[in-house]
């Protein structure tokens, strides 16, 4: 089951005892998933959701809290509708329900944001408002670089009201318009986890956090592997460059090179990929890596001085781009 469906399934099964919170959830769900329609001169309240369990929860809450009967219509997937949708409709008592849930104000005008009683309600009401909004039009992506908890909103006023509700819960959410659609987005991983718990999806939060941690561990392992690979490549290039310079140094100095420096240089050329420590062990008698490095350094310095005096290419001339590219 996708993360969004997991959250919605868990929220739909959540038992809420507070009447105020249940009313806030219904009001928010109707606001974000529904609309008011005039049919034969009467106000009809409709809410379209993507899971049958959400539709049944809404129908039950409307009856338990307000005493009005709602009908659930199933819209099967066909044509441009990719999945089955469920429409909860209250026709007979639509206007009364709209007024009581705050979809209409006292003058009978549609409310653009969230109802005042929800905006000014308790923290539990703010949690319920988010729960209703997510059940209506929420989505949660898999943990990763672009992970997000997002709610599509019916307008900018509703989006700002939802941002305010998140702020009351200690969560930073942002309202933005994407391709003409108003959305509220939470991107921070810790904030997403906190909001899931606040809404009542603790089990899904644990699953999401586990996947998030696994992904972070994999990403860290990949970074370390890449880091090790890069270090190996740098070391290989440095060894090849050093061997090429030493080879050129031996050419420049010819028979004038001191025996102990020639021995160190010959080892470097013969074992191009070996570390200084390994070269020291191969020497006869064995030397420390510092002793090997010192002798090679003196060999290069002596060769570069002679090259300058003779006006010929120095040891650096042996290190060509093609040489490093092949390393």
Curated annotation (Swiss-Prot):
Regions recorded as binding DNA: 275-308
Keywords, sorted A to Z: Cell cycle, Cell division, DNA-binding
Protein origin, superkingdom: Bacteria
Sequence segments annotated as region (Disordered): 304-327
Annotated TM spans: none
Task performed by this protein: Involved in cell division and chromosome segregation.
Family: Belongs to the WhiA family.
Name of protein: Probable cell division protein WhiA
Species this chain originates from: Mycolicibacterium gilvum (strain PYR-GCK)
